[in-house]
């Protein structure tokens, strides 16, 4: 098997095992990597070197190296990833190989490696072999620095505008801003922003919470009525409006949840104070508004005097002077009744007793008998109706033409027809009694003695009297007695003797 010329310099190690020195070198380099975060380019180179097999750098005058054994893949990958290992070496570097290796190692690690016992060295060897099979962990990123960003290493990308946060604190957390310099320049990459949002949460939460505005002092009772309720409400609105959504978005959800109870307590206290002051001011304003003089209400109407009698039978119609009779809708032809007539008509009404003394005694005098004559009062009332309707709708005959009397039906009327009432008018007046038509026809037959369709004064008065008797409950007679005709004939108070015809 041919030996590479560069391998000759590697075969001249210093006193001590080469594997021990390589293990110490790799352990020291791992400590440095843990302290310093790798950049984006170094991550990509390390990932590429671990994924593919290591290839040696081709230099001028060199041949292809044999495949590297599979026992140390990570060690050779780390050596190839470092600057200086992949570059071609000259023969001069091979001659001074021992000094180069010593110069790359720090003094502390060399002194520590020489004085260490063999037990720890063996553990370091085992750790290097295990680390070759186990992939390297992702390094923990360092806390963000507030200095100016390095524009040479970080690519320039635009940050998408975040949506405005909800007013009442929604469940979605607000996007966090890691540094002020990155917001101004807008040079944060999406990968670094996602890692900062996922891993820098506790770092932002550790910042001190912003101080809440001082709580206003309680107003004294002497100063509360002096201030107007409008000024207090305006101050309360200004304090609420000072919390802008942009300032609220910089706080973390933990801070918002933690300070929500205190803000609610403060707002409730402000609302109670503002409401109490507003109530006091409104009461003062209403007291001033109501101080104006009010017009006294009108006095209630006086009650009308009423009779204090227990029994309603003793009360008369004329107790209330304000009672007015309703105006009649039709023209009245009868005379108004006098007080003497009413007293005479109601003479037997007041003689009635609640409990009769002799229940089996027949009151013969109190019984209403058939009247054989028309009273003077009734006759005057009926004559008034006759006087208002006599001669109505009766044509007047012309006495000059004798030939026309035979042909004209008006010639059958007597010369005194103007003092009579026509049958049509009689039917209209008698029908107002609401008696049935057969009864009215019977009364007409009893009264009409001339059979010419006209009624004289006596006939009309007797007919009216028969209607009233029928309404009172008396039956119609088969023939009108002579006493009734005599009571309505002539002048009242004078009786004329009957002469034979």
From Swiss-Prot:
Residues 1-270, 286-375, 396-415 are annotated as: Disordered. SMART domains: EH. The keyword Phosphoprotein does not apply. Residues 347-362 have a biased composition (Basic residues). Residues 1-44, 363-375 have a biased composition (Basic and acidic residues). Residues 87-99, 188-200 have a biased composition (Polar residues). It holds the Pfam family EH. This is Increased rDNA silencing protein 4. It comes from Aspergillus clavatus (strain ATCC 1007 / CBS 513.65 / DSM 816 / NCTC 3887 / NRRL 1 / QM 1276 / 107). The gene is irs4.
């Amino acid at each position: 098997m041919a030996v590479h010329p560069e391998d000759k310099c590697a075969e001249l190690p210093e006193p001590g095992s080469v594997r021990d020195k390589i293990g110490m070198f790799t352990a020291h380099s791992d400590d440095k990597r843990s302290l310093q975060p790798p950049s984006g380019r170094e991550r990509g180179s390390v990932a590429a070197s671990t994924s593919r097999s290591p290839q040696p750098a081709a230099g001028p005058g060199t041949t292809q190296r044999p495949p590297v054994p599979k026992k140390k893949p990570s060690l050779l990958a780390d050596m190839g990833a470092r600057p200086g290992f992949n570059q071609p070496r000259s023969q001069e570097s091979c001659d001074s190989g021992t000094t180069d290796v010593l110069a790359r190692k720090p003094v502390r690690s060399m002194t520590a490696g020489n004085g260490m016992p063999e037990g720890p060295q063996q553990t370091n060897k085992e750790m290097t072999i295990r680390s070759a099979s186990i992939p390297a962990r992702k390094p923990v990123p360092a806390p963000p620095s507030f200095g100016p960003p390095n524009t040479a290493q970080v690519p320039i990308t635009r940050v998408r505008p975040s949506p405005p946060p909800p007013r009442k604190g929604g469940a979605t957390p607000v996007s966090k801003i890691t540094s002020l310099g990155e917001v101004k320049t807008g040079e944060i990459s999406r990968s670094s922003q996602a890692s900062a949002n996922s891993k820098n949460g506790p770092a932002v939460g550790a910042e001190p919470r912003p101080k809440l505005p001082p709580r206003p002092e309680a107003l004294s009772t002497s100063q509360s009525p002096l201030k107007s309720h409008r000024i207090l409400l305006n101050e309360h609105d200004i304090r609420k409006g000072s919390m802008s959504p942009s300032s609220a978005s910089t706080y973390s959800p933990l801070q918002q949840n933690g300070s929500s109870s205190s803000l609610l307590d403060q707002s409730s206290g402000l609302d109670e104070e503002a409401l109490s002051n507003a109530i006091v001011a409104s009461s003062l304003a209403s007291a001033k508004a109501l101080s104006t003089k009010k017009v006294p209400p009108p006095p209630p109407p006086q009650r009308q005097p009423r009779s204090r009698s227990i029994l309603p039978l003793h009360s008369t119609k004329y107790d209330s002077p304000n009672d007015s009779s309703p105006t009649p809708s039709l023209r009245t032809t009868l005379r108004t009744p006098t007080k003497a007539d009413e007293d005479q008509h109601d003479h037997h009404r007041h003689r009635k007793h609640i409990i009769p003394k002799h229940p089996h005694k027949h009151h013969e005098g109190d019984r209403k008998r058939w009247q054989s004559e028309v009273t003077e009062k009734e006759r005057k009332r009926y004559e008034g109706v006759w006087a208002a309707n006599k001669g109505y709708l009766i044509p007047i005959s012309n006495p000059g033409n004798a030939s026309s009397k035979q042909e004209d039906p008006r010639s059958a009327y007597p010369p005194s027809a103007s003092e009579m009432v026509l049958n049509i008018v009689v039917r209209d007046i008698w029908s107002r009694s609401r008696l049935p038509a057969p009864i009215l026809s019977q009364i007409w037959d009893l009264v009409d003695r001339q059979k010419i369709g006209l009624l004289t004064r006596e006939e009309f008065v007797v007919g009216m009297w028969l209607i009233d008797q029928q309404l009172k409950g008396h039956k119609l007679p088969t023939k009108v007695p002579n006493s009734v005709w005599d009571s309505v004939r002539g002048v009242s108070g004078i009786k004329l003797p009957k002469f034979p015809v």
